[in-house]
A protein has these predicted regions:
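Intrinsically disordered, low-complexity terminal segments enriched in Ser/Thr
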Residues: 43, 171-174
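Portal/gating segments that form or line small-molecule/metal binding sites
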Residues: 203-213
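N-terminal mitochondrial targeting presequence
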Residues: 1-28, 32, 36-90
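Residues forming anionic-ligand binding surfaces in small-molecule and nucleic-acid pockets
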Residues: 228-232
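Conserved phosphate-binding/catalytic loop of the ribokinase/pfkB sugar-kinase fold
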Residues: 234-238
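Catalytic cores of Mg2+-dependent Asp-rich isoprenoid enzymes
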Residues: 21, 50-53, 57, 63-67, ...
Length: 410
């Protein structure tokens, strides 16, 4: 009798706990949406992403899907995005939907981090991360598709300048009159390319002469060149951990630099933060894809680590679970990623970047998902080929990203 009463009491306690929990989550969700949709009419995202929702079912979808969710029509017709840039707004809206769908399909965690950014700051990170996702997806091609991958990457490399060159620039004459000129460089016929160009055009109108598109082109080209070198070397390994860190910094850190610069965040300290965080993300991604890469007879474990553990690349390609030598090599790469992550946060705190740039932390939310995966890797004793590491619990990830965004931390 006592045991049954105890069970009943426990059930009632749990029942009330879950009822309270879901009520709180629902209320937080409402507050979160209200914050996100406040004053959306004055942003670039308002013109690109305004779309009405016809049913309550669609509003109850995952929290991350608010990017194109409902927003009451604004009375104002103005926007920080200039409609005089000779872009068709309807087609541009479709382009951003395509970019969002690409990010959601191939890099879901980055998609969540992007959606947690304030609406008036979201378009730039979305376009740039979709571009990085697109180029990264090309490099996952097998060795037999090497030439095709190189052609695709070369196409992006050749069009980097036209993508990042604003379509419209405003100049002021000596008489005080403002004139707009349109560049003659052809824009690539690709949705993500048009998104990136729209962001560059908007940044030029906001920042004016402070925007240096040549620097953006240089950063993006370096990232694509690193991808091309990676594809070109095929199954060849990186010589050292330092080479792997350089690759990670080039492919992810450069995109972070452009993202911050587009939001007028530029300083030596912010560059260090972007560099360290990009390196941490790249190192972590090299481990996250270890199992899939092994099937394609490719690995990002550098030669110095494999030699130190007396393990061959063929052993890595087998993808055996529980191999202590591979665990040790994984631990060293993960430790390097943790070190760069800590350095990024330390630079952010020591230089008071949160006070100087209140919106900067949300642009760096990828640190949250990176740290979460590294913690999961440690939980499974750095056994990088475990199937559990390939799964991403969406609710837990959304919750963690939301909390960090709400706290304005990364």
């Amino acid at each position: 009798m006592y045991r049954n009463s105890s069970r009943l009491s426990s059930f009632i306690t749990q029942h009330h706990f879950f009822r309270i929990f879901f009520v709180v989550v629902k209320q937080i969700g409402h507050e979160f949406n209200n914050t996100i949709f406040r004053d959306r009419s004055n942003t670039l995202a308002s013109i690109i992403m305004r779309k009405s929702i016809g049913s309550a079912v669609r509003r109850r979808r995952a929290l991350c899907d608010f990017l194109f969710s409902s927003s009451s029509p604004s009375k104002k017709k103005t926007s920080s995005y200039s409609t005089s840039s000779h872009q068709n707004i309807d087609s541009l809206r479709e382009d951003f939907r395509y970019a969002s769908a690409t990010l959601r399909r191939y890099d879901y965690e980055t998609y969540l981090c992007t959606n947690a950014i304030d609406a008036n700051k979201r378009a730039g990170p979305l376009a740039l991360r979709a571009l990085n996702c697109e180029t990264a997806g090309i490099t996952t091609a097998t060795v037999s598709e090497k030439e095709i991958a190189l052609v695709k990457l070369k196409w992006w490399h050749e069009h980097a300048e036209s993508m990042l060159t604003p379509r419209t620039t405003t100049t002021t004459t000596t008489t005080g009159e403002k004139t707009k000129t349109t560049t003659a460089k052809p824009l690539p016929e690709h949705p993500i390319a048009r998104c990136v160009n729209a962001v560059a055009t908007h940044a030029k109108e906001v920042l004016g002469s402070e925007m240096n598109e040549a620097r953006y082109v240089r950063w993006i080209k370096r990232a694509i060149e690193a991808r091309m070198e990676d594809v070109d070397k095929g199954s060849s390994l990186f010589d050292s951990t330092a080479d792997l860190e350089t690759f990670a910094r080039e492919t992810h850190g450069n995109f972070l630099l452009v993202t911050l610069d587009c939001e007028n965040i530029r300083s030596m300290a912010s560059d260090h933060v972007a560099s360290h965080l990009g390196t941490a993300i790249g190192l972590t991604n090299s481990l996250r894809g270890a199992k899939i890469n092994a099937r394609n007879r490719k690995t990002y474990f550098p030669m110095d680590l494999l030699a130190a553990e007396n393990v061959s690349a063929e052993t890595v390609y087998e993808g055996q679970i529980g191999d202590e030598r591979i665990k040790n090599a994984t631990h060293k790469i993960a430790s390097a990623a943790v070190g760069h992550l800590a350095a990024a946060r330390r630079n952010f705190a020591e230089n008071n970047l949160g006070e100087k740039y209140p919106h900067m932390a949300k642009l760096l939310l990828q640190a949250t998902t990176t740290e979460r995966w590294l913690e999961k890797l440690e939980k499974y004793d750095f056994d990088v080929f475990r199937d559990e590491l390939q799964r991403t619990p969406p609710l837990l990830t959304q919750g963690r990203v939301f909390v960090q965004a709400w706290k304005n931390q990364f």
